[in-house]
UniProtKB/Swiss-Prot annotation:
One of its GO terms (biological process) is dGTP catabolic process. Residues 1-20 have a biased composition (Basic and acidic residues). Keywords: Hydrolase. HAMAP family: dGTPase_type2. This is Deoxyguanosinetriphosphate triphosphohydrolase-like protein.
């Protein structure tokens, strides 16, 4: 395997499953763009329809709630940016880590995790549904870009290292240690075996670990920011012992690795930060808005820089890539991030109005799924109709239905339901 002395990645990392013909549309006398393989991969994800659809898919609150909502797309952009900054400090390829951030939620269905739950119910007898496995399926087959010699879709035909950087759960359903999450379906096991060739079993590459931590940081900090702006979260609860104890109790039930005492200590540390105190009772004034933005910026820096420093201390100097290091995050920092997640859970996701809305969303997905199946292939988009017609059994046909719904934006799903499948 060829490795440039200045490039810590080798030809094996840059290999694609399907060989691609040279481009032919360039003008005579011109040269193609001088881009790395990972820069090309990043561009493929950036220009994909699946990424654009995330603009109309829920992060925490719906994409049409409020004037400046966070969607799955804006969240993915934030994860990509945080990950890229961490890659600078660790010596990972910047395009590779940014790509992983952009693609980490590309398989999410309408209504985010709530939609995942509904589609998992729809496909329960046929392998279920998982957003992370759908990420892999989109990148390796569903998103049109490259065909193999038999005319089958190879998806975006990303390099091995790029695909591996998106895999947070490198196993199939039921194979993961202590988690129900999984990274690919049985249907995609050949592609997964190709990507994971030579990789340590059950272990994420460093670039995927960076993406995963960037996801945690973005989710915890920015979703709390949205909660503060919407007046659902008041950060002063962190300094109230009774409120903090209630959050710690909830957190202990949600995070098995973080105890109540750890949550209480995290609340004391965060509430003592000047940037937290400066937000106070948010009132949307200029001063309050600036204070909140400074808070989010400083917390992102706090959590990202802690991971960089701790990893460097353990792994030493030089480029840290692929399986040459493990991302190390201090336990106290993990507790702080977990506490912010609990704030969003307590004051946003546990709101009875939010839960009622979610119940209606799941019903809609079930309704549309059965309407699609009953009328298939007529009710499906052409690509999915062809897949339905050639499906070998009922399980494969239901997988097509799930793929179709997962591809919908929330607006399209709701229009279809109102027009065809509604009561």
């Amino acid at each position: 395997m060829t490795r440039n002395q200045h490039d810590p990645y080798d030809d094996f990392d840059r290999q694609r499953r399907v060989a691609e013909a040279p481009k032919t549309a360039g003008l005579p006398g011109t040269e193609g763009q001088h881009r790395t393989d990972f820069a090309r991969d990043r561009a493929r994800v950036l220009h994909s329809a699946a990424l654009r659809r995330l603009a109309d898919k829920t992060q925490v609150v719906g994409p049409r709630e409020g004037d400046t909502p966070r969607t799955r797309l804006t969240h993915s952009l934030e994860v990509a940016q945080i990950g890229r900054g961490m890659a600078v400090g660790l010596g990972c390829d910047l395009d590779l880590v940014e790509l992983a951030g952009l693609a980490h939620d590309i398989g999410h269905p309408p209504y985010g995790h709530n939609g995942e739950r509904a589609l998992d119910e729809v496909a329960a007898a046929y392998g279920g549904f998982e957003g992370n496995a759908q990420n892999f399926r989109i990148l390796t087959s569903l998103e049109p870009k490259v065909l193999d010699a038999q005319g089958n879709s190879a998806g975006l035909n990303l390099t091995r290292a790029s695909l591996d950087a998106v895999i947070k759960y490198p196993w199939r359903r039921g194979e993961g240690p202590g988690t129900s999450k999984f990274g690919f379906y049985d249907d995609d096991r050949e592609a997964a075996a190709w990507v994971r060739a030579g990789a340590p079993a059950g272990r994420m590459c460093l670039e995927a670990q960076v993406m995963d931590w960037a996801d945690d940081v973005a989710y915890s900090v920015h979703d709390v920011e949205d909660g503060v702006v919407s007046q659902r979260i008041d950060l002063r609860v962190l300094a109230d012992d009774d409120e903090a104890a209630a959050l710690a109790k909830l957190g202990e039930s949600e995070f098995s690795r973080v105890g109540a005492d750890d949550f209480m200590a995290a609340a004391r540390r965060l509430s003592a930060l000047p940037v937290v105190a400066a937000v106070g009772k948010y009132d949307a004034t200029l001063a309050s808005s600036v204070a909140l933005k400074r808070l989010t910026s400083e917390l992102v820096g706090r959590f990202a820089s802690a991971a960089i420093a701790t990893t460097r201390a353990a792994a030493g100097p030089g480029p840290l890539v692929r399986y040459r290091a493990e991302l190390a995050v201090p336990d106290l920092v993990r507790a702080e991030v977990a506490l912010l997640k609990i704030l969003a859970l307590q004051f946003i996701m546990s709101d009875p109005r939010h839960q009622q809305t979610q119940a209606g969303q799941r019903e809609r997905i079930h309704r549309v799924a059965h309407w699609l199946y009953a009328g298939a292939p007529r009710t499906l988009d052409p690509v999915f109709a062809a897949a339905f017609n050639t499906a070998a059994d009922d399980g494969a046909r239901w997988r097509v239905i799930v793929d179709q719904i997962a591809s919908y934006t929330e607006g399209r799903l709701e229009r279809i339901d109102a027009r065809q499948a509604g009561p």
